[in-house]
Amino acid sequence: METPHIPVLLEEVLESFSRVPEGYFVDCTLGYAGHSSEILKRYDHLKHIGIDRDDEALAFSKKRLEPFRDRSTLYKGTFATVLPTLKEAPVTALLADFGVSSLQLDKKERGFAFDSETLDMRMDANAPLSAYEVVNTYPKEKLEYIFDTYGEVRSYKKLASAVVDARAKAPIESAKALSEIAKGVIPPGGKIHPATLMFQAIRIEVNNELGEIEGLLDAIEAKHYEGEVVSLITFHSLEDRLVKNRFRKWSQECICDPHAIRCTCGKKHALGKALSRKPVTASKEELRVNPRSRSAKLRSFRFKSDS
């Protein structure tokens, strides 16, 4: 079976789970099962749960994981909603890769690519909100907010005005047309396409990506297991900040008010510890083979174990 997506930081992810005990491995962003298939091959003491909201990805992964059908179960939905409902236990390894898959980026009908003839960007094709609605119906002030907050676009006001001016003449029907608007506002240059940050912002809005990550972290915090390792791959600073701050919170022994004169909590409140101080990034070899890995950052956290 031809693999449409190269999993990022694969060896580093595998290594992060090298000491997990017997139990369930949950892939919260199953995609095309690149990480899952390799983890199932290497760690035969783990059973597998895959979660995704993309029907196409689930159908592909079901076939790809057929050799492991006795150890694998797939669920459709967002990870923030599915994870709290899982009955399978104990979960000893959990992975989430928050990037958009290469297949989604490359398939023009999905509307993620800069030259797509559609304007969609939905991870779940049945979801009510698409990029078309965001671009063509959101008021200028709301576009400014998402371009600034989710895309960290410097010229967010100019960009929002350009979008509103363009759609006043005719609806913006394609990602390609939207890219041209960005090119007219943001000068070319540097390593990324002028529309990159705008597309990121719209995609985050359409799929509630930051809200989903917060929901996942809340679900993990509410229900985790002894010795469980959580490995999360982020692709931009907004995602990484959420993960870094939550891992820092989970690592804190003291939960007293920062302004307290002395500690009264006993300093025994850490849930576990991060496996590395800084995020793990792609090697030079991986960057050569898969340039899309350049923005990937892996952070891993191990919950405490009595043993």
UniProtKB/Swiss-Prot annotation:
Recorded GO MF terms: rRNA (cytosine-N4-)-methyltransferase activity
Name of the protein in its database record: Ribosomal RNA small subunit methyltransferase H
Upper lineage: Bacteria, Pseudomonadati, Campylobacterota, Epsilonproteobacteria, Campylobacterales
Function according to Swiss-Prot or TrEMBL: Specifically methylates the N4 position of cytidine in position 1402 (C1402) of 16S rRNA.
Annotated signal sequence range: none
Enzyme Commission (EC) number: 2.1.1.199
Family (UniProt): Belongs to the methyltransferase superfamily. RsmH family.
Source species of the chain: Sulfurovum sp. (strain NBC37-1)
Annotated localization: Cytoplasm
HAMAP family documented for this protein: 16SrRNA_methyltr_H
SUPFAM superfamilies linked: Putative methyltransferase TM0872, insert domain, S-adenosyl-L-methionine-dependent methyltransferases
